[in-house]
């Protein structure tokens, strides 16, 4: 197996600490069936540390140190993920960085440093679809004394009067409701229980009824959750000419 040894240059997620790198590379290379191809790092994840000339140069220096100490080629240097694209496009990425692990920028078309649209990409590539299973006009504020909800939160409510509220067959066991943005700007995600999503449909651009499908754009976290939920069916749309 060809492997990359991950080293931590500041984000404090995965990766050995720099002063352990040589020992780990040497030990890994001694294992049967293992071919250490190079080193890599991860940024803009747990700690939100942005890729920079400084931490990328540090990664190159660590590779050079491990190469000199072990005699291994270590020709691959994986500088990070989608968050590295702005640095790369600026021309400031050290030339030794020859690999990036791109996910969100390709799938969702977003700059992961600020979630702005990435140039020449689309942001409508993934939809989360739920079906309306109940549709009722109800008050927008609960009746009676309130405390914590089912998830230990104290929720505040805005009085919008009587509203058309849909219950959809999607819940927190599948995705956090804050990670869903309605495709229809007239829809408002109000919240969710474990298996039900509550959406205000009063200002829907189209008429709705029980059985109507409601569509949402997911954030990266929403895509991660729904893509790994066994209760969410996945389907790939047929490519079409733009």
Give, region by region, the residue ranges found by the protein language model.
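Active-site loop ensemble at the mouth of alpha/beta enzyme cores that anchors a bound cofactor
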Residues: 85-168, 174, 178-182
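C-terminal accessory subdomain/extension
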Residues: 139-242
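Generic secondary-structure boundary/loop-capping signal
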Residues: 13, 40, 97, 103-104, ...
């Amino acid at each position: 197996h060809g492997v990359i040894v991950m080293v931590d240059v500041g984000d404090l997620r995965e990766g050995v600490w720099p002063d352990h790198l040589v020992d780990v590379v040497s030990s890994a290379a001694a294992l049967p069936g293992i071919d250490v191809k190079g080193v890599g790092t991860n940024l803009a994840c747990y700690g939100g540390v942005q890729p920079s000339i400084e931490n990328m140069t540090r990664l190159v220096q660590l590779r050079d140190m491990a190469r000199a100490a072990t005699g291994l080629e270590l020709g691959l240097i994986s500088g990070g993920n989608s968050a590295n694209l702005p640095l790369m496009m600026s021309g400031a990425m050290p030339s030794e960085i020859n690999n990036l692990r791109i996910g969100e920028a390709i799938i969702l078309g977003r700059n992961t440093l600020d979630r702005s649209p990435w140039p020449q990409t689309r942001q409508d590539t993934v939809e989360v679809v739920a079906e309306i299973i109940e549709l009722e006009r109800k008050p927008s504020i609960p009746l009676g004394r309130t405390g914590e909800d089912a998830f230990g939160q104290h929720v505040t409510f805005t009085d919008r009067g009587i509203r058309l509220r849909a219950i959809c067959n999607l819940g927190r066991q599948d995705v956090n409701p804050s990670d869903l943005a309605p495709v229809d700007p007239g829809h408002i995600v109000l919240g969710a229980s474990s298996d039900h999503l509550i959406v205000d449909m009063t200002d829907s651009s189209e008429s709705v009824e029980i059985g109507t499908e409601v569509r949402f754009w997911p954030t990266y976290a929403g895509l991660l959750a729904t893509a790994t939920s066994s209760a969410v069916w996945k389907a790939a749309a047929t490519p079409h000419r733009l």
